[in-house]
């Protein structure tokens, strides 16, 4: 296999690393899992991606897309060929200020994107704890959320469209499709056409739709990455719903198992209000903490995060984090961290008062 991979390296503009050190570095992500890959490919362009896919098809090799590798559950770990797009697919392609949309390649870092957007009064809302190094492609693959998901939603909800390379090396753009446009796609003899035909045949039977509706987590639960989001596809008008069909919603959260993404268009939000405050409520039991969540969520929060005693105790003996826990009073069983924001100091104080009153009466 090494000889074949070396030959592949000679046919692409990028590189394929086969040395033991490179394999060891890419054998894990930010998780505890470890598998030595066959090699690591660094494609430079679309043609490289297509050649890599053709190689994997010809040699029955698994393909593992990867960006920053900050995932915590082994999403980009495997014994196939790792395809790292973080090195060359790093361009912010375009910004549409009127539509408040930006198009990027998957290797763009989340915080660097927001640095670019800030002068325009815009930002990309989902904010993982690794926002200064995680990349948009990985956020799409994982359907990342972050602390402000209660206000700005998850990554899937921000995706307007995606361009991708499919299993046969052909390209496709996934975006909102009307019922008529969906039917036209089904008539195509391409790989993309096969996808739409397959989706329709799989999901159109009412019995299947009923099983999906009954078995999948409630849509009201924002952070619910439990496999392919086929339940969301049922909202499309072609399948009996009232929304356009968008395959990008299925790609988000699929962890790179369905296609290689080359471009992502995102819907942006206005920058959040600049006046902010954090209220930290302390509890003697985890149950009391959880009971307060529903009442305080009525107060237009930007963040609502819980830390229990296990996490709090871990920070006591950590040299770095012990400096960050000075707000903790006593030895609580749990705390809630509640962020409020406003466009003025006066409005902020009003929001704080509302939150404090809600806490007192809950």
Kindly give the residue locations of the regions a language model identified.
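Generic non-transmembrane alpha-helical segments
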Residues: 3-15, 51, 55-59, 116, ...
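Gly/Ser/Thr-rich beta-alpha loop segments that engage phosphate groups in nucleotides
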Residues: 69-76, 109, 136-143, 148, ...
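N-terminal flexible segment immediately upstream of the FAD-binding catalytic core
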Residues: 1-54, 58, 68-100, 129, ...
């Amino acid at each position: 296999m090494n000889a074949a991979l070396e030959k592949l390296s000679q046919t692409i503009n990028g590189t394929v690393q086969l040395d033991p050190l490179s394999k060891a570095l890419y054998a894990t992500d930010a998780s505890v899992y470890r598998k030595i890959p066959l090699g690591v490919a660094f494609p430079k362009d679309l043609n490289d991606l297509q050649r890599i896919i053709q190689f994997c098809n010809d040699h029955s090799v698994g393909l593992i897309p990867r960006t920053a590798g900050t995932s915590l559950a082994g999403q980009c770990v495997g014994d196939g060929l790792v395809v790292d797009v973080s090195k060359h697919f790093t361009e912010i392609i375009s910004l549409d200020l009127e539509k408040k949309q930006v198009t990027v390649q998957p290797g763009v870092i989340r915080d660097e994107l927001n640095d670019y957007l800030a002068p325009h009064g815009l930002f990309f809302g989902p904010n993982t704890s690794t926002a200064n190094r995680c990349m948009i492609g990985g956020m799409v693959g994982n359907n990342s959320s972050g602390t402000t998901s209660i206000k700005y939603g998850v990554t899937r909800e921000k995706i307007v469209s995606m361009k991708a390379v499919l299993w046969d090396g052909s390209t496709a753009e996934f975006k909102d499709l009307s019922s008529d446009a969906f039917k036209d796609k089904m008539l195509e003899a391409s790989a993309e056409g096969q996808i739409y035909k397959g989706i329709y045949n799989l999901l159109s039977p009412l019995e299947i739709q009923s099983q999906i509706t009954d078995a999948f987590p409630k849509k009201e639960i924002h952070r619910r990455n439990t496999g392919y989001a086929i339940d969301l596809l049922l909202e499309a008008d072609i399948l009996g719903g009232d929304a356009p069909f968008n395959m990008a919603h299925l790609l988000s959260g699929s962890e790179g198992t369905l296609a290689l993404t080359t471009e992502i268009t995102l819907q942006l939000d206005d920058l959040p209000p600049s006046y902010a405050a954090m209220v930290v409520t302390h509890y003697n039991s985890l149950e009391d903490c959880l009971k307060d969540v529903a009442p305080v969520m009525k107060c237009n929060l930007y963040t609502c995060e819980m830390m229990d005693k296990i996490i709090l105790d871990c920070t006591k003996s950590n040299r770095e984090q012990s400096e960050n826990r000075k707000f903790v009073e006593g030895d609580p069983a749990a705390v809630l961290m509640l962020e409020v924001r406003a466009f003025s100091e006066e409005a902020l104080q009003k929001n704080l008062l509302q939150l404090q009153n809600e806490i007192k009466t809950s």
